[in-house]
């Protein structure tokens, strides 16, 4: 628990939160999402947002990928939902599996599609280590999805190459002196 020592007002643009394990990156993101309260001061986000935590808890374990995508998109016609799932690499069989049975990369792509393709899409997307535990093909697909996202991103990641692939230059970074905001 390390405080942000100065008041910060950040306009919405793409940002990364970086630092070593245990420094509080996920806690900062959870505060922005309204899942944790600040110990001191206040944290306020005044735009609608979507939050994908490391466990992708937004995905109902028993619901199929097809059902989830249709629910997120207010009754998207089944044929269009199946086409979108095929583009994500989920064939007709995998589209009917419960979300809990999908691989990490499949779950992440499905969760992102549910957020990005929803109407209206959230103008702010918070992602907690989306590049963890996924294969290279899924990572490249996630990078492409995020580059096409029209809203602002705040991403927690240890992977400098992933952050660079998303063209994120502004960072809230943990250093030996505490949290530092770096703008490129």
What are these regions (language model features)?
Residues 1-8, 12:
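Single conserved hydrophobic/aromatic residue that forms the stacking wall/gate
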Residues 8, 48, 123-124:
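The start of beta-strands in P-loop NTPase/AAA+ ATPase cores
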Residues 14, 19-77, 158-161, 165-184:
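ABC ATPase nucleotide-binding domain signature region
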Residues 54-124, 129-132, 137-140:
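ABC-family P-loop ATPase nucleotide-binding domains
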Residues 139-150:
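Helical segment within the ABC ATPase nucleotide-binding domain
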Residues 151-156:
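Conserved H-loop
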């Amino acid at each position: 628990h390390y405080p942000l020592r100065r008041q910060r007002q950040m306009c919405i643009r793409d940002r990364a939160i970086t630092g070593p394990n245990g420094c509080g990156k996920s806690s900062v993101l959870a505060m922005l999402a309204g899942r944790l309260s600040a110990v001191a001061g206040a944290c306020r986000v005044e735009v609608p947002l979507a939050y994908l935590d490391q466990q992708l808890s937004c995905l109902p374990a028993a619901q199929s990928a097809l059902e989830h995508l249709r629910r997120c998109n207010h009754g998207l016609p089944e044929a269009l939902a199946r086409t979108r799932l095929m583009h994500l690499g989920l064939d007709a069989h995998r589209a009917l599996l419960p979300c809990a049975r999908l691989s990490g990369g499949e779950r992440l792509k499905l969760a992102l599609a549910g957020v990005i393709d929803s109407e209206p899409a959230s103008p702010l997307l918070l992602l907690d280590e989306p590049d963890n535990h996924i294969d290279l093909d899924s990572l490249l697909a996630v990078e492409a999805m995020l580059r096409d996202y029209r809203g602002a991103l705040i991403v927690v990641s240890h992977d400098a190459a992933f952050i660079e692939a998303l063209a994120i230059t502004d960072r809230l970074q943990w250093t030996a002196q505490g949290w530092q905001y770096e703008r490129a």
